[in-house]
């Protein structure tokens, strides 16, 4: 059975690839992303050496989503009222949460903002899912486990 799937923070590397795959499998896919955390506008010139290349990659990503009929609404998922209205409008069967600060240097510079963008968005998503009895899939990274003693990390590696 095909599903209505909402990706929160879905314009990143993982999110846009996941959206394309889910759409190819026949699902109805919708993305919401603030486009303000990990995109080109959130970096200073000194943060990125190949700014034009990076901008091109992001623009190509957005064009690819559009070309494949994947709708994007620019919305900050920290805004509970606005994001709840959006969730109600799309009425997803499944919500996949990808919103986060994905760059370690940005996370370390501003842990408060990292918490706000990573967990306030998750809190709002979980609250909606609880009220509407929707499934949530939470994707994260190894950064949530802290620093590791070795360069290689496996499922058996002890967390810091």
Please report, for each region that a protein language model flagged, where it lies by residue.
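N-terminal Rossmann-like NAD(P)+-binding domain of SDR-like oxidoreductases, especially those catalyzing
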Residues: 1-160
């Amino acid at each position: 059975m095909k599903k209505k799937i909402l990706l929160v923070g879905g314009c990143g590397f993982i999110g846009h690839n996941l959206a394309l795959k889910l759409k190819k499998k026949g699902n109805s896919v919708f993305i919401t992303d603030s486009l303000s955390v990990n995109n080109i506008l959130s970096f200073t010139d000194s943060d990125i050496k190949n700014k034009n290349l990076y901008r091109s990659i992001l623009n190509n990503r957005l064009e690819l989503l559009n070309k494949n009929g994947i709708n994007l609404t620019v919305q900050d998922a920290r805004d509970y009222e606005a994001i709840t209205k959006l969730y109600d409008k799309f009425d997803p069967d499944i919500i996949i949460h990808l919103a986060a600060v994905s760059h370690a240097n940005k996370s370390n510079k501003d842990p408060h903002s990292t918490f706000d963008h990573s967990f306030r968005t998750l809190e709002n998503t979980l609250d909606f899912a609880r009220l509407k009895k929707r499934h949530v899939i939470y994707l994260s990274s190894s950064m949530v486990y802290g620093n590791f003693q070795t360069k290689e990390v496996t499922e058996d590696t002890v967390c810091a």
